[in-house]
Amino acid sequence: PLEKDESINAILPVKEFSEEEFVFMVTSSGTCKKTSLSNFSRPRKGGIIAIELRDDDKLVGVEITAGKHDILLFSSAGKSIRFKESDVRSVGRTAIGVRGIRLATKDKVVSLIVAESTDPILTATEKGYGKRTQLDEYRTQARGGSGVISIKTSDRNGQVVGAIQVTDDDEMMLISNKGTLVRARAVDV
């Protein structure tokens, strides 16, 4: 049972609770946390804490990682940052974490990508605009910086709603808040 104001934000398939793998989490405020997957091997009936959140913060993305890839964070204002996963040290379950990206006042993180391949990144805005960018165009920088502009946000484009890593063969399904689905090939963006 969940608390009154609590909801499920992520589901992860786990075969083995290995010490060589990690749970990497990011919150809307840009906080990142990396915890050994083995720390989650003994859950309690009432659940266990995965990350300690501040009042106005929420969990945005969770991935299982090998600890050796690059991390990309994308914000609603079109900013992004790429840094080494090794820049975030592994901490216990109840820790808050560290700053992944420095955000402007009303900006928030909307996507987490663990770059396990060199495939391009597709960024989409709330008004249906998208941009496909080669991964190597996102330069690696120190964790906690302001990042770079990934896509321009404007009245025409709207805010960024998400970013995903795609291949030329991928097809995407974009679904509006009214339930309308648009299908597009990644290579056409």
What is each stretch, according to the model?
Residues 1-189:
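Short, structured "edge-of-domain" segments at secondary-structure transitions
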